[in-house]
Amino acid sequence: MARIAGVDIPRDKRVVISLTYVFGIGRTTAEKILAEAGVSEETRVRDLTEDELGRIRDIIDRIKVEGDLRREVSLNIKRLMEIGSYRGLRHRRGLPVRGQNSKNNARTRKGPRRTVANKKK
C-alpha cells in the first residue's frame, strides 16, 4: 500500500479512486491532482512509479487535507458557537443547521426520540 498524506491507499484500485480515501480529496480534486501530475486516471496504484507518487505527494502537500482540514472545520464550528450566531446555536443544540424542518424529522441530528409523559388534565 502506498502512503499519501498519512493514509494507506488501496493498491488494486485506480489512482483516481484511491486518492478519495484521503479526507478532503473527492473525485474532482483527485482528477485535478492527477492532471497536474501528468498521471493517467486509469493507472492502478500498484503500477505507479516512485517519481509519479512523489509528484502526487508534492501536489497534495499544497492542499489542506486530513488533520489540518478536520481541525479547521472543527475550529470554524467552535467559532460559530462562541460568537452566538444562529448556526452556532443550532450546532450547540444538536439540531439541523441548514434550515431543514425539525418538527417531524431531523432524527439523525436529534438522536432517538425521548418520550415525554402527558400531564393529567
UniProtKB/Swiss-Prot annotation:
Renumbered to this chain, region (Disordered) spans 91-121
Keywords, comma-separated and alphabetical: Ribonucleoprotein, Ribosomal protein, RNA-binding, rRNA-binding, tRNA-binding
Listed Gene3D superfamilies: 1.10.8.50, 30s ribosomal protein s13, domain 2 (4.10.910.10)
Where does this protein have coiled-coil stretches? none
Membrane-spanning ranges: none
| SUPFAM superfamilies the UniProt entry points to | S13-like H2TH domain
The UniProt record lists the keyword rRNA-binding: yes
Molecular function terms, GO-annotated:
rRNA binding; structural constituent of ribosome; tRNA binding
> How does the annotation summarize its subunit structure?
Part of the 30S ribosomal subunit. Forms a loose heterodimer with protein S19. Forms two bridges to the 50S subunit in the 70S ribosome.
NCBIfam families, per database record: uS13_bact
Q: Which protein family is named in the record?
A: Belongs to the universal ribosomal protein uS13 family.
Q: What is this protein called?
A: Small ribosomal subunit protein uS13
Q: Specify the species.
A: Bacillus cytotoxicus (strain DSM 22905 / CIP 110041 / 391-98 / NVH 391-98)
